[in-house]
Amino acid sequence: MNSFEIVASSTESTVVAEYTPEKRKSTDYQSEAALEQDFINRLVSQGYEYITIKSEQDLIDNLRTQLEKLNNYTFFDKEWNDFYNSVISNGNDGIVEKTRKIQEDYLQNLTLDNGYVKNIKLIDKTNIHNNHLQVINQYEEDGGTHDTRYDVTILVNGLPLVHIELKKRGNAIREAFNQINRYQRDSFWAGSGLYQYV
């Protein structure tokens, strides 16, 4: 029976590791910045779009653009503001409710200015190739308990759904999990809480 080292665990999940060391050891030093750039380059080579996001407003504007493309619909400003505030960044929603929106309730209602209702997909689960994948890095959040800078985030249709903390060779992977747990506690909820979708 294999035994696994527990890297991180919570009431929702457990991450384990099984490591078989390679006989060949690299003597090359790779900084965390170089590791990050290499990782981004690999994602771009697989079809991800690299974009620069410097503020929460940039993140929100990109989200609107991506949802408009996915749904082949252009929001009027009032429609977008209502949809964004009531569905995407609803202040009453926490991480559980936001996860449910992605996993189960990914089709949301938009009440149009003319009173009609239109379905808006957050994610296309029928044809996953309709979803647009983007990668950003070094996004800074200063509205949390502490100022933070996130290494790499993958956006799916503009929503931050995957967050990656990279560690250079020699640093324990556990440090990355601890850092993400700190972010979840101290900053993912900041601003309009978009990082709670991670």
Give the residues covered by each predicted segment:
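An alpha-helical interface "stripe"
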Residues: 1-198
